[in-house]
Amino acid sequence: AAGLPSAQTRRERIQRVVDLLVANHKDLTEAINEDFGGRIPAYSVMNDVLGSMVSLKHVRDSLEEWMIRSPRATGAMQDQLGATAYVSYQPKGSIGIIGTWNAPLFTLLSPLACALGAGNRAVLKPSEIVPNTAAVLAEAARRTLDPVEVAVVTGGPEVADLLTSLPFDHLVFTGSTTVGKLVMANAAKNLVPVTLELGGKSPSVLSRSAYISSAASRLAIAKSTNAGQLCVSPDLIYVPRENTEAFIDAFTDQFTGLFPTIADNKDMVSIVS
């Protein structure tokens, strides 16, 4: 048996994913732009490429320290018998990772960094809502990565349903609460543990002492990032009644300043749906 993958092996696996991103970032960001019907590549580089790089490189450079056994205290009786206790961090095995469309690379490659750093192998399933991105990533993975270590599968909901029905050692899903329930139900049939990063409400609250202008500026930037298509994008704002009109005026001014025009504005991200 090969035994547990060494720190060097894990670093090499992660580095191959880093190399894939570097070599294919233009094709990937162009595919994202095509899938969105307009998303400036610079944003995709910042959010998906560099965002993924941060996770990959952090795990790559830190994993050896994380692999060290962690000592624990023993109970009184065991201690008297000379016992020692420790936590030994071992790979789970095979990890299924299902990403979402609004950050199609980051929601796959950031969890992948953790999976590879822990010595696991992984199967990635990009969102079918971004088919061009999924196809480019799958082809890049085929050329660059060992499919026994990291594989990419593409397809629609039926593929995701099949994937989540398999007896993985862990499943990671990013997406809607509705689909998250389906993922958990499928995983439960095989007692597969899951990590779910689901959507929800993201309210903002302005107090009476808030600076209306600066709050409006920050919220306009936050709401316009990726056209509001982020789980942390503010979708509800609580404003003191007496400040409502002042805030609406300030927010409108700030948003108009960011995007004086909509038509043919390459800085505007399109709505995927």
Residue locations for each model-derived region?
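N-terminal Rossmann-like NAD(P)+-binding subdomain of aldehyde/semialdehyde dehydrogenases
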Residues: 1-84
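Residue-level signal for inorganic ion chemistry
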Residues: 10, 56, 119, 150, ...
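Conserved small-residue-rich beta-alpha loop and adjacent elements
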Residues: 75-145, 191, 213
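A structured beta-alpha segment of the ubiquitous adenosine-cofactor-binding alpha/beta core
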Residues: 84-85, 152-169
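Short beta-strand segments
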Residues: 98, 174, 197-199
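ALDH superfamily catalytic-core signature
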Residues: 145, 178-273
